[in-house]
A protein has these predicted regions:
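Extreme N-terminal leader/targeting segments of oxidoreductases
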Residues: 1-36, 54, 251, 277-278, ...
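A glycine-rich dinucleotide-binding beta-alpha-beta segment and adjacent secondary-structure elements
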Residues: 13, 455-542
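N-terminal Rossmann-like FAD-binding beta1-loop-alpha1 element of flavoenzymes
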Residues: 34-61
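Glycine-rich FAD pyrophosphate-binding loop
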Residues: 54-75
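Glycine-rich active-site loop/strand segments that organize a redox cofactor
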Residues: 79-119
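Conserved redox-cofactor binding core of oxidoreductases
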Residues: 120-289, 467-492
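Glycine-rich loop(s) and the adjacent beta-strand/alpha-helix scaffold that form part
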Residues: 190, 238-357, 562
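An anion/pyrophosphate-binding glycine-rich loop and adjacent beta-alpha core
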Residues: 336, 345-451
């Protein structure tokens, strides 16, 4: 018997409580009374707060960690196109129509064509809005395929648009806009802060009120079910407990992010992080007080996904539970659960994005990737999430790269000579050293790996024919992106989801269903819930089928601003 997911049940995996009915909101006692309450202050939350304040609404922003969420921790990429100012300065002609044609292939109907067109049409204006609020970009473009551009490049192809199967449908253009920061450009990390912090400062100038770390436990609804506010647990501003709590949380987060849990030493660091998190939680139990926030226009749930709620991932998306979580401890599913307590419907909760990047080093993308039978299943030059989707959804998360002696040597040259960032280089080095098997012949490699010998031999022959231009590759990979299997020895590199030293990063894409015109949360009957909105990874959005670099951040900004615009337009 399946346990229903509701507050207090074993399938809930959350501290979120049932919604509380406020019989008369006008007569109730409120600690804070504003037009808009934003729950979760990362990319989507700050976009909603800032855009609402720009239109004259009063805003209170609440966040349990006050660290910018996953947006502040990401690579600082915003997926944008249609002819942005940055694209034009770099000399690239892009249109909303070409952007739409490409994203339609990736979105696969997860949002309507009308919403996808709106996203593309508004994309140039989004970049202008970011620039207007102090976010900096540069127009130096990287022309080739890569998972992430070198430090001195700021515009790149952040998707599969250069792959053969896509160029036949849509004209490619570099749409990955990396923010510029002189400080972060020296270290190669922290670019996401250069996206989030200017928006946070702009929101403060517009009068957005922020509070000490605040955990929203309950939605407050009127007798008709409309959301009228939230109940949050928070510290007294400036208290010693607040400062100590922040210190424990910072330490815990740093330890969690220091190493993937699969790496040697990773589990130890995660256990150490749990100790600091427990100290923070003890302070929360001892010193927090409840405050009630009224939201006259609406509550925006923008608290991220649930990738760091490991029991929730294991229950809802077990095929991805071996992957490396990408996000922050605030991605615990609380925003989604809050929406459900008001009757909100969810979708795609078992759908995650995973990334198996094979370039850089470019040598890996020129090899062939096979499953447990020894059969290919994708174009190896695709964007990492497209490769991982095929591997995890259709091939049990199993994958091995097959390299001949020449490609193996080239891979080493790539990692030693090319300007790779540590997160691009180090896992590949470890995989080449410790996650490989070697054999003198392809037949011997098949036997060692347990491949079907007939299937593997046919795969290798077909790959060589396509690489030589003698046949069409069934996955659309161009001969220019392929290297035929030459002389041995031959290598099989483990790139499966269970690979300990070459982790597969994962991110949840499911969430609350929303009315696409407004961002209002929909109930199980498909009707909007008055006073409740969702944005970013708390909601279903443009990237909820297949992620490409910067698309989640762009969707956070788009959906946050969409919710703010609807609340500003609402009649009191």
């Amino acid at each position: 018997m399946v346990t229903e997911a509701k507050p207090g049940s074993s399938a809930w995996f959350s501290h979120v409580e049932a919604a509380e009915v406020v019989s008369d909101p006008a007569a109730a006692a409120w600690d804070v009374d504003v037009d808009v309450v934003v729950v979760g202050y990362g990319g989507a939350g700050v976009a909603a707060a800032l855009h609402a304040a720009e239109q004259g609404l009063s805003v209170a922003a609440l966040d349990r960690f006050n660290n910018g969420g996953s947006t502040a921790m990401n690579g600082g990429i915003v997926y944008a196109g249609g002819g942005t100012a940055v694209q034009r300065e770099a000399g690239y002609a892009d249109t909303p129509e070409e952007m739409f044609k490409y994203l339609k292939m990736e979105a696969q109907g997860v949002v309507s064509d009308a919403t996808l067109r709106r996203f593309c049409d508004e994309s140039p204006g989004l970049i202008d809005w970011l620039i207007g609020h102090g976010v900096k970009f540069k127009a130096k473009a990287f022309p080739g395929k890569t998972s992430y551009p070198p430090l001195d490049y700021f515009l790149y192809h952040a998707d599969s648009s250069l792959a053969g199967g896509y160029t036949a449908v849509s004209k490619p253009a570099p749409r990955g806009h990396k923010v510029y920061s002189a400080i972060h450009n020296k270290t190669g990390v922290g670019f996401g802060r250069a996206l989030w912090e200017p928006l946070r400062h702009a929101a403060e100038r517009q009068g957005v009120k922020t509070f000490p770390p605040a955990e929203v436990r309950r939605l407050l609804v009127d007798p008709q079910g409309a959301v009228v506010g939230v109940a949050a647990l928070t510290f007294e501003p400036g208290s010693a407990a607040e400062r100590e709590h922040a210190r424990y949380r910072r330490t815990s987060t740093k330890l969690l992010l220091a190493l993937p849990p699969q790496f040697p030493g990773g589990k130890f660091l995660w256990k150490l992080a749990a100790r600091y998190s427990a100290k923070a939680e003890a302070l929360e139990r001892a010193h927090r007080v409840e405050r009630r926030f009224r939201a006259r226009r609406g509550v925006v749930l923008s608290a991220g996904g649930f990738i760091f709620n490991r029991p929730m991932v294991e229950a809802l998306a077990p095929k991805y539970s071996a992957g490396m979580p990408l996000g922050n401890p605030g991605d615990d599913g609380s925003g989604i659960r809050l929406g459900q307590t008001a009757g909100g419907a969810v979708d795609r909760m078992s759908h995650l994005s995973a990334w198996r990047f094979l370039n850089p080093p470019v040598a890996l993308s020129r090899s062939m990737l096979v499953d447990a039978r020894g059969a290919r299943f994708c174009d190896e030059s695709w964007y990492g999430s497209a490769i991982a989707y095929e591997m995890c959804e259709r091939h049990e998360g199993k994958g091995w790269l097959i390299l001949d002696a020449g490609l193996y040597r080239q891979a080493w040259r790539n990692v030693l000579r090319d300007k790779l960032l540590p997160f691009q280089r180090d896992p590949v080095v470890l995989a080449l050293l410790f996650q490989r098997r070697k054999a003198a012949t392809l037949e011997a490699l098949a036997a060692k790996m347990g491949f079907d010998p007939v299937v593997f031999a046919q795969t290798a022959r077909a790959y060589n024919d396509a690489a030589a231009g003698q046949a069409q590759d069934p996955f659309g990979k161009t001969a220019a992106d392929m290297s035929p299997m030459g002389e041995g020895p031959y290598y099989a590199i483990d790139v499966s989801i269970t690979s300990r030293l070459f982790p597969l990063t994962t991110l949840t894409l499911g969430g609350l269903k929303v009315e696409e015109e407004t961002g209002a949360v929909l109930n199980t009957a498909g009707k909007p819930i008055k006073g409740l909105y969702a944005a970013g990874r708390t909601a279903i959005g443009v990237c909820s089928h297949l992620y490409v670099s910067g698309l989640s951040a762009a969707d956070c900004l788009f959906s946050g601003r969409r919710a703010a615009a609807d609340m500003a337009a609402a009649v009191n």
